[in-house]
């Protein structure tokens, strides 16, 4: 099996683990926009490609998939998930399976406020989240939330821009200076537990899960 890992970046250990799991039967190909990205050197073969915002990016990845007879393609950065999801059919036509969420799921997961709305509508307990200052003011006046709070980009990743806010003036400055922030209740010293769930791409059923 040949798997293409897009935007490999610094995730050398991840590719190394995949290599060990796949054994001699597997072939790993990686791409990145920089030849200095360490993870590409864990692959059997690599390509230096344009950035994901480049108009030629998608056609470049499709061309690599055709040339290398890639069985499956995935990405190691969040912003690229939507791109692959939107063009799933184009990859399927050349015999390449896209290993990422479907477009509808990707839209929900990549937008933190949309995710909050989805969880709330489905009665799944989650962190209180506000998409703008006005809705936060209403909740604050009602005593539903208090300081400190936590702000982060609505569509950000890698904890970039995420930080604790201790009072109203600081919050107003943050929201005015960075459009697109959301406001969340501060979880304090709560224990952070990540849960990974693996879904079979054919049956769409969960096959394994573990916490870390």
What role is predicted for each listed range?
Residues 119-120, 141-161, 179-190, 209-211:
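ATP-grasp fold ATP-binding core
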Residues 96, 104-132, 138-144:
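Glycine-/Pro-rich loop/turn segments that contact NAD(P) or position catalytic residues
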Residues 64-70, 143-145, 178:
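Glycine-rich phosphate-binding loop signature in dinucleotide/nucleotide-binding domains
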Residues 37-43, 141-144, 173-177:
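Short loop/helix-cap segments at secondary-structure boundaries that form the rim of catalytic
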């Amino acid at each position: 099996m040949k798997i293409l890992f897009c935007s490999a970046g610094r995730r050398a250990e991840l590719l190394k683990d995949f290599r060990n799991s796949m054994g001699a039967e597997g072939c790993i190909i990686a791409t990145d926009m920089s030849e200095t990205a360490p993870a590409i050197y864990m692959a059997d073969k690599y390509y230096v490609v344009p950035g994901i915002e480049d108009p030629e990016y998608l056609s470049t990845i499709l061309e690599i998939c055709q040339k290398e007879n890639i069985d499956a393609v995935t990405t190691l950065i969040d912003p690229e998930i939507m791109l692959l999801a939107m063009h799933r059919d184009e990859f399927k036509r050349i015999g390449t399976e896209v290993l990422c969420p479907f477009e509808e799921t990707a839209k929900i997961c990549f937008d933190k406020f949309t995710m909050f709305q989805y969880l709330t509508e489905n009665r799944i307990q989650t962190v209180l989240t506000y998409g703008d200052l006005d809705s936060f003011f209403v909740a604050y006046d009602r005593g539903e939330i208090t300081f400190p709070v936590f702000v982060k980009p609505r569509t950000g990743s890698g904890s970039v821009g995420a930080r604790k806010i201790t009072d109203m003036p600081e919050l107003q400055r943050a929201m005015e200076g960075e459009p697109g922030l959301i406001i969340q209740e501060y979880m304090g010293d709560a224990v952070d537990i990540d849960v990974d769930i693996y879904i079979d791409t054919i049956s769409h059923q969960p096959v394994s899960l573990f916490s870390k």
